[in-house]
UniProtKB/Swiss-Prot annotation:
GO molecular function ontology, one term from the record: zinc ion binding
Feature: compositional bias, Basic and acidic residues: 180-193, 420-431
Record's protein name: Probable ADP-ribosylation factor GTPase-activating protein AGD6
Function: GTPase-activating protein (GAP) for ADP ribosylation factor (ARF).
Lineage: Eukaryota, Viridiplantae, Streptophyta, Embryophyta, Tracheophyta
Positions of the UniProt region annotated as Disordered: 118-195, 214-248, 333-459
Biased composition (Low complexity): 142-153, 345-359, 381-392
Gene3D superfamilies xrefs: Arf GTPase activating protein
GO cellular component: cytosol
Gene this protein is translated from: AGD6
Biased composition (Polar residues): 335-344, 360-380
């Protein structure tokens, strides 16, 4: 913005409100090499001269550096025209001849030195001869001439060299064909420069571009050329593109992902810690202010005492329950084993009684029986017939108390059979039955039966 304001200030000066090479007003282009302002048409001609002769910039559309602003301040349209007038060059002189003159070269050096702050002394003035370009040959009546530069001699090299020059426009060709002897400003000729001058200009161009390339190498690459950066683009070799290594890309992406994840985790942990610390401080301050810390400690002590007391009571209750459970398990185990033994003995006694009845019937049919045996048998049958579902519990108890002899001898084993004769009068049937069984066994031993009874059955 500061550069634009300075340019506007310079442009608002009276001598800079008109183009330096023509009468066009309000010029919007400038030549940094001379510090002058020009119109659009003349700026195109200046661009054709080359940047080493005239470096053209737009006042509004281009960016300007500090050194360029200083060159514009050191120059000016009126100063340039006065300087050229000392060398005999008028304002209406052709742009090509004007700015390729020795006076233009001296003025460029003068502007460069003043912008850089170096002292400058103008050299002695040597007026230059104003050489007019040769007039065009031929017209409508002389179109067949080989030297007229018309379309009939388009393949003639000599005519082409004499008429076709750089910066020669279509208007120049029309002027040369329409008006014989007319003066064309923008048309150059071989008579303007000698061979030695052209060779010197070529050598100067090579040195100029070499110097420009050396200066460009020393400039930074991060800035645009308008701000003093390095020229990189058309006409120069750019840096080779870096090789794309997929493995490096993957590792870089993974490392960046882990790095970002670690940063997020660290920030989250820091935020959580700060929040917890703030909440803890607030809670502690409120507790201390309200006197809740003493109440909380008392409550904790009471809860601890109650918990200990309840624990002791619970442990005592659990010990009592475990002792009761152990006692009950032992009682149930003993009762189960006793009932199993009694059931086995009842089954054995029942089988013995039935088998005894069968043997009694057989003995009575073979050798005759005693009246007591028959009465006992009848009594047993009566007792069996009287066995019903109404008295099944009483009969079961009676069977449990009944005992059978273990051997054929008259002596009985008292182990486990004590109190077997302590029965009521209603159990006489079982006593008779036992006596019958003893008589049968003795008869068997005396007679034909050799069966012996053991605790497990017959042998």
């Amino acid at each position: 913005m500061a550069a634009t304001r300075q340019l506007r200030t310079l442009q608002s000066q009276p001598e800079n409100k008109v183009c330096v090479d023509c009468a066009q007003k309000n010029p919007q282009w400038a030549s940094v090499s001379y510090g002058i302002f020009m119109c659009l048409e003349c700026s195109g001609k200046h661009r054709g001269l080359g940047v080493h002769i005239s470096f053209v910039r737009s006042v509004t559309m281009d960016s300007w550096s500090a050194i360029q602003i200083k060159k514009m301040e050191a120059g000016g349209n009126e100063r340039l025209n006065k300087f050229f007038a000392q060398y005999g060059i008028a304002k209406e002189t052709d742009i090509i001849s004007k700015y390729n003159s020795n006076a233009a070269s001296v003025y460029r050096d003068r502007i460069q030195a003043l912008a850089e702050g170096r002292p400058w002394n103008d050299p002695p003035v040597v007026k230059e001869a104003n050489k007019k370009p040769p007039l065009a040959q031929g017209g409508y009546g002389n179109n067949n001439n080989n030297n007229n530069g018309g379309w009939d001699s388009w393949d003639n090299d000599d005519s082409y060299k004499s008429d076709m020059r750089r910066n020669q426009s279509a208007n120049d060709f029309r002027a040369s064909g329409n008006r014989e002897g007319a003066h064309v400003k923008s048309k150059s000729s071989e008579d303007i420069y000698t061979r030695s001058q052209l060779e010197a200009s070529a050598a100067g161009k090579e040195s100029f571009f070499a110097r420009r390339m050396a200066e460009n190498e020393s400039k930074p690459e991060g800035l645009p050329p308008s701000q003093g950066g390095k020229y990189v683009g058309f006409g120069s070799s750019s840096a080779p593109p870096p090789r794309n290594n997929q493995q490096d890309d993957v590792f870089s992406v993974v490392s960046q992902g882990f790095g970002r994840l670690s940063l997020v985790a660290a920030s989250a942990a820091q935020s959580a810690a700060s929040v917890v610390q703030t909440g803890t401080k607030e809670f502690t301050s409120k507790v201390k202010e309200g006197g809740y810390d003493h109440k909380v400690s008392e409550t904790v002590n009471v809860v601890a005492n109650k918990t200990t007391e309840i624990g002791h009571r619970t442990w005592g209750i659990m010990k009592g329950v475990m002792a009761m459970a152990t006692q009950k398990v032992e009682e149930f185990t003993k009762e189960g084993s006793t009932s199993w033994n009694q059931q086995s003995e009842n089954e054995g006694n029942g089988y013995y009684q039935n088998f005894g009845n069968g043997n009694k019937a057989a003995n009575s049919s073979v050798g005759g029986g005693r009246p007591q045996s028959s009465s006992t048998s009848g009594h047993y049958n009566n007792s069996q017939n009287s066995n019903s579902w109404d008295s099944w519990g009483e009969n079961e108890n009676k069977k449990t108390e009944a005992v059978a002899p273990k051997g054929s001898s008259a002596s009985n084993d008292d182990d486990g059979w004590t109190g077997w004769d302590d029965h009521d009068a209603k159990d006489d049937g079982f006593d008779g039955h036992y006596q019958s069984a003893g008589d049968k066994k003795s008869a068997g031993h005396n007679g034909k039966s050799d069966t012996a009874w053991t605790g497990g059955g017959f042998l």
